[in-house]
Amino acid sequence: MLAAIRPAGKPPGLWALPKGQIDQGEPAEQTALREVAEETGAHGRSLGKLGDVKYVYTWPPKPAEGERIFKVVSFFLVRYSRGRLGDIPPAQRHEVDEVRWLPLEEAPGLLAYRGEQEMAARALARLAELAL
């Protein structure tokens, strides 16, 4: 199973992986574990990095006025250990409208973003290698 979120303000049926900004001095792997807990309520341990997704976007989203931002998002395979899905800390509730478990085998077809679909496919392959 894969913990997925519907980011705040996004339409029903749009599923994404938890992610967020790295705090100063925080390793990327620790950021991934923190963001999963903050955005889903689930805690876990890392089984290693799956890869990076790189993209460019404009902010604010008006091309004539916005600044082009280059972003790298690192994804890690996280094994669930405890917590209740949807038990989101009050400070993060504004970021997420819905949390749910998705069957990992179906996740590449259910996630909205191409890079995240690829990470779900990599997670399936990694779990097969690890025989988990």
Predicted features and spans:
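Active-site segment of metal-dependent pyrophosphate-handling enzymes
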Residues: 41-84
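The catalytic Nudix box helix
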Residues: 17-51
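Conserved N-terminal beta-strand and adjoining loop/helix that marks the start
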Residues: 1-2, 21-24, 72
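N-terminal strand-loop-strand
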Residues: 1-17
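Short aromatic/basic micro-patch
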Residues: 16, 70, 101
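C-terminal alpha-helix
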Residues: 122-130
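NUDIX/MutT-family hydrolases
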Residues: 75, 86-120
